[in-house]
Amino acid sequence: MSAPNPKAFPLADSALTQQILDVVQQSQNLRQLKKGANEATKTLNRGISEFIIMAADTEPIEILLHLPLLCEDKNVPYVFVPSKTALGRACGVSRPVIAASVTTNEASAMKNQIYGIKDKIETLLI
């Protein structure tokens, strides 16, 4: 695998990537996940996104570089994971996924897990 694109910052390490993908998979089961750059953009604009996950091996990466700008405007944490294929698998689809958004739900059973990952992503951004 080639070196990740330097524009893909912050990039999660392997342990954090695994935790993020686990949360993504569980969020998908609870219908708290939006897949794709366009749907991620919609969740940000509506203010229902907890955090955004993007794939660092997206080619060309510029097709999702509008998301970090939007995230910073809306004060939503974001992170890059190394593989779009792994993100696609975690999202429960057979195709690669370049961006995903975990959405808010106050009554969710996963609220604590989501906030835990959100805190870890925020520490990467500092």
UniProtKB/Swiss-Prot annotation:
It is found in: Nucleus, Nucleolus. Keywords: mRNA processing, mRNA splicing, Nucleus, Ribonucleoprotein, Ribosome biogenesis, RNA-binding, rRNA processing, Spliceosome. GO terms for biological process: box C/D sno(s)RNA 3'-end processing; maturation of SSU-rRNA from tricistronic rRNA transcript (SSU-rRNA, 5.8S rRNA, LSU-rRNA); mRNA splicing, via spliceosome; snoRNA guided rRNA 2'-O-methylation. GO terms for molecular function: U3 snoRNA binding; U4 snRNA binding. Disulfide bonds: none annotated. Pfam families: Ribosomal_L7Ae. It comes from the Eukaryota. Its main location: nucleus. GO terms for cellular component: box C/D methylation guide snoRNP complex; nucleolus; small-subunit processome; spliceosomal complex; U4/U6 x U5 tri-snRNP complex. Component of the U3 snoRNP particle. Binds to the C'/D and B/C motifs in U3 snoRNA. Component of the 25S U4/U6.U5 tri-snRNP particle, a subcomplex of the spliceosome. Binds to the 5' stem-loop of U4 snRNA. Common component of the spliceosome and rRNA processing machinery. In association with the spliceosomal U4/U6.U5 tri-snRNP particle, required for splicing of pre-mRNA. In association with box C/D snoRNPs, required for processing of pre-ribosomal RNA (rRNA) and site-specific 2'-O-methylation of substrate RNAs. Essential for the accumulation and stability of U4 snRNA, U6 snRNA, and box C/D snoRNAs. Belongs to the eukaryotic ribosomal protein eL8 family. This is 13 kDa ribonucleoprotein-associated protein. The gene is SNU13.
